[in-house]
Amino acid sequence: MVNTTIKTTKSQEVFAAAQNLMPGGVSSPVRAFKSVGGQPIVFDRVKGAYIWDVDGNQYIDYVGTWGPAICGHAHPEVIAALHEALEKGTSFGAPSTLENVLAEMVIDAVPSIEMVRFVNSGTEACMGVLRLMRAFTNRDKIIKFEGCYHGHADTFLVKAGSGVATLGLPDSPGVPKAATSTTLTAPYNDLESVKALFEENRDEIAGVILEPVVGNAGFIAPDAGFLEGLRELTHEYGALLVFDEVMTGFRIAYGGAQEKFGVTPDLTTLGKVIGGGLPVGAYGGRRDIMSMVAPAGPVYQAGTLSGNPLAMTAGIKTLELLQKPGTYDYLERITKKLADGLLQIAKETGHTACGGQISAMFGLFFTSGPVHNYEDAKKSDTAKFGRFHRGMLERGVYLAPSQFEAGFTSFAHTEEDIDQTLAIARDVMSSL
C-alpha cells in the first residue's frame, strides 16, 4: 500500500509560482482544490490508470482527465497513431479524410446523430447547439436543469452545478441578466416542473437541454420514466430535446445515454472521449436540423482548429479500442465493484453515504440520500468529503477534488487497482 504521508515540496513550489502567472494558479477553477481544501497536486506524467506528480508520487487515477481517458492514459495504440499523424502536420485548417472517418463512426454509434459538426470543446458544442435549436424552432427560451453544466457560455451559467460556486442568477459576474433571461430552470428528475414551465411559456420554448446522467452535481442518475417523459413533453409542445452527452457519450455505453436508456433526443453534444484526450467537441442530430448549420444553412458557427487531424486521429483510435468485445462489460463490473465497495465500507465504518454508478461513471455522497437532484446533492457533508479526499490523496488515490463531480474508471484499471482503492478507503474512512 502507498505510504500515508507523501512529500509534495515540488508541487507546492510550482503551484506557488503558478499563482503569480495565472488566475488562481490554474487553467480551470476546480483544479485549485478550493472545494476540498489543501494544496493542489501538480502532475508530471500519466500512463494507464496511474498518474505521477512532480515529486514522483504515484496515484491511482479516478479523474481520467475529467472523462476522456476511458482507455487509460497514453494508450500505446493512441500514441502510435498520433505519432504517425504528427508527421503529416498538426493542423490543416481545411477538410481532411480523418473528419469523414470519425464522423461516420459517431453517426453509426449515436442513435440521434444523422449529421455532425466538430468543434474544439464541450462548451463550443453547447453554444452551437443552443443557436441551432433557437433558429430551427424560431423560439428563444430554453429549459435547463439545476446542477447540470453545459459549459461556460453566458446563457448556461444559471444554477450550473460544479461549474460555478454560487446559486445566483446569473452564476458569474460579467454575465448580464439579459443573457440568462431566456433560460428557465427546473429541478432534475421533476417532470411536473418541466410541464409547468411549458404551460407558462407556450410556443416560446425552443427546447430542453440536460445531462441525461448528471455528472456536474456529483453522479445523479435519471429516475425511471424521466427521460421518456421529457421526450413526450417536448413532442407535445413542439420543442427540441437535447442530450448533453459530453460526459456520458461513449462512456456509459458506446452509443451513450440514449443507447443505454432507449430515448432518442433531437440533438446531442459530445466531447471528452471522442477526442481521446485531445481538445474536441461535437454536436449533431437530425439531418433536417443539422442542415441549417453554415455553410449548408444560415446558422453560423466556425473554428480555426475544428476537426484538426490530431484530435480526429486520437478519437478514431479511441473508438476503435472501445469497439472490442467485452469492453463495456468489464467497465461495468469493475466500476460496480468500486461503487458498491465504497458504500459498504462507509456503512461499516459508521458514515452516512449514498451513491452509485452506471458503467464507467460513479459517485459517492456523504448524505443519507437518495440523491435525485441538485438540492439533494447539496445536503452532502462537503467538509467530510474534503477530509476523505485528502486522506485518499495522501495514500495514493486521486479522486475528483469536489463532492459535486462524478468519478471515472477506464479499462486500464485492474481488479487489483479496485481492491487497493477499497482497502485505502477503509483505512481513510476509519480515521475520519
From Swiss-Prot:
Q: What is the E.C. number?
A: 5.4.3.8
Reactions accelerated catalytically = (S)-4-amino-5-oxopentanoate = 5-aminolevulinate
Q: Which residue ranges run through the membrane?
A: none
Cofactor(s) needed, names only, are: pyridoxal 5'-phosphate
Primary localization = cytoplasm
Give yes or no: UniProt keyword Isomerase.
Answer: yes
SUPFAM superfamilies from the UniProt entry: PLP-dependent transferases
Picking any one GO molecular function of the record gives: pyridoxal phosphate binding
Q: Name one GO cellular component term.
A: cytoplasm
Pfam families for this protein:
Aminotran_3
Please list the GO biological process terms of this entry. chlorophyll biosynthetic process; protoporphyrinogen IX biosynthetic process
Give compartment(s). Answer: Cytoplasm
Pathway annotation: Porphyrin-containing compound metabolism; protoporphyrin-IX biosynthesis; 5-aminolevulinate from L-glutamyl-tRNA(Glu): step 2/2; Porphyrin-containing compound metabolism; chlorophyll biosynthesis
InterPro entries listed in its UniProt record: 4pyrrol_synth_GluAld_NH2Trfase (IPR004639), Aminotrans_3 (IPR005814), Aminotrans_3_PPA_site (IPR049704), PyrdxlP-dep_Trfase (IPR015424), PyrdxlP-dep_Trfase_major (IPR015421), PyrdxlP-dep_Trfase_small (IPR015422)
Q: Origin, by domain of life? A: Bacteria
Q: Which residues carry this modification: N6-(pyridoxal phosphate)lysine?
A: 272
Gene3D superfamilies the UniProt entry points to: Aspartate Aminotransferase, domain 1, Type I PLP-dependent aspartate aminotransferase-like (Major domain)
- Identify the keywords attached in UniProt to this record, alphabetized: Chlorophyll biosynthesis, Cytoplasm, Isomerase, Porphyrin biosynthesis, Pyridoxal phosphate
HAMAP family, per this entry?
HemL_aminotrans_3
Similarity comment: Belongs to the class-III pyridoxal-phosphate-dependent aminotransferase family. HemL subfamily.
How is the quaternary structure described? Homodimer.
What protein name is recorded for this chain?
Glutamate-1-semialdehyde 2,1-aminomutase
